[in-house]
């Protein structure tokens, strides 16, 4: 793909766009004027991409999943048409073009539209539920598509193993460690179904936390099954509804209708601090800070050690990437597109307003967020949202695509206007 550098787009060059009808109170401008002018000129000047490097056929109901250099297409079951579900695997070559040949296909009789696909070690996992039963996980051999095992529950990576969470009925939930190759259970623990959360590391879950309304919190090692700590964090108090989330070294407990936040050390369950915020939805690491996100939008950046609010932003509701002291944040946009900006992580100051893009896919630490937006004449701009550089770089302009795109560190996949999907390798 050709690389077109737009240069820096700074906050001070982003006045309110004209002729935009008023929306909700407080909704600011989202598209920097300089970026808009540059993209308009690119629509006529940038070279149109050649036909798709690779193509695969697909129905309108087919869902695609990228994993490194593999592509998986999941076709849900269609009972009225007499079709069962199907999973198809493709390998995406490093070079070349044209239609891809499937590596393998395997039937999925109960596959649904909400199922998901993930790869762990040498197995492909299809996870989801059906209207008449609990969630299930089905494992296939990555190389051949041969069925390895099937079991109930939600599934997540945990180092070399997998964790499954089974809920439902009157019984407590059960978290089990499963061998990815065989599906055999190594160990399991019973936990409260409505009060079990997990701490996520780059290689998967490493802590299981049960924090029921009684206040008796238990923490397990998700790799060994050993119980690490048990403590009553509300001694002498009556049971009160709470929800919790683990972020790095902290266990964050939210009470009083999502207004009071208490932080504990996850290792010792020692109380660190307590603050009051408005209607907290969830938390996430923001570099050295802790970010809290509101149920109705907006975010707070908190000092991890004290809980003090370092800064607040009302426009943004999600952080996608933090890198080199800068954060890529997402806010409300229009249609399938969201607004994006780069903030200084320490102060919340806007470094660059990147305008509106459709961004999807995974964002590994060494990867890069990729956005798409309509150009004209059935074309799409493809751009890298450069966090460290504080700018947007248009990588290419694709023709004959309708959107429904996703990207990982190396590949971009979009639905083609003529049917099926196109796959492109991203420029460096």
Per-segment meaning from a language model:
Residues 1-428:
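Secretory-pathway ectodomains
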């Amino acid at each position: 793909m050709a690389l077109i550098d737009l240069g820096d787009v700074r906050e001070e060059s982003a006045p309110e766009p004209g002729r935009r009808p008023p929306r909700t109170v407080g909704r600011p401008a989202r598209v920097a004027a300089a970026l808009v002018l540059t993209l308009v000129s690119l629509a006529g000047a940038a070279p149109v991409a050649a036909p798709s490097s690779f193509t695969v056929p697909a129905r309108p109901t087919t869902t695609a999943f990228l994993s490194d250099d593999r592509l998986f297409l999941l076709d849900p079951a269609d009972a009225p048409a007499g079709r069962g579900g199907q999973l198809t695997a493709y390998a995406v070559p490093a070079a070349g073009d044209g239609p891809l040949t499937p590596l393998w296909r395997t039937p999925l009789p109960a596959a649904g539209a909400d199922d998901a696909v993930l790869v762990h070690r040498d197995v492909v996992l299809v996870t989801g539920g059906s209207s008449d039963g609990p969630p299930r996980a089905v494992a296939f051999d990555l190389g051949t598509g041969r069925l390895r095992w099937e079991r109930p529950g939600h599934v997540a990576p945990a180092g070399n193993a997998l964790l499954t969470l089974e809920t439902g009925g009157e019984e407590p939930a059960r978290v089990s460690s499963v061998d990815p190759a065989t599906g055999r259970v190594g160990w399991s623990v019973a936990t409260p179904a409505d009060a079990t959360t997990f701490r996520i590391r780059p290689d998967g879950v490493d802590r299981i936390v049960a924090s029921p309304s009684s206040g008796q919190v238990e923490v397990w090692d998700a790799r060994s099954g050993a119980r690490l700590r048990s403590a009553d964090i509300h001694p002498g108090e009556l049971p009160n509804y709470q929800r919790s989330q683990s972020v790095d070294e902290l266990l964050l407990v939210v009470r009083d209708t999502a207004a009071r936040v208490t932080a504990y050390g996850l290792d010792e369950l020692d109380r660190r601090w307590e603050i009051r915020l408005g209607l907290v939805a969830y938390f996430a690491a923001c570099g050295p800070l802790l970010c809290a996100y509101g149920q109705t939008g907006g975010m707070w950046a908190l000092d991890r050690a004290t809980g003090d609010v370092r800064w607040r932003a009302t426009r943004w509701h999600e952080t996608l990437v933090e890198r080199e002291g800068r954060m890529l944040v997402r806010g409300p946009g229009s249609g399938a597109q969201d607004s994006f900006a780069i903030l200084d992580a320490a102060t919340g100051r806007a470094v660059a307003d990147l305008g509106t893009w459709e961004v999807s896919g995974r964002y590994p630490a060494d990867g890069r967020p990729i956005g798409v937006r309509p150009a004209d004449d059935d074309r799409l701009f493809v751009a890298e949202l450069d966090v460290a550089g504080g700018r947007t770089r248009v990588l290419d302009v694709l023709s004959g695509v309708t959107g429904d795109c996703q990207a990982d560190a190396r590949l971009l996949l979009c639905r083609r206007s003529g049917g099926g999907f196109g796959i492109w390798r991203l420029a460096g």
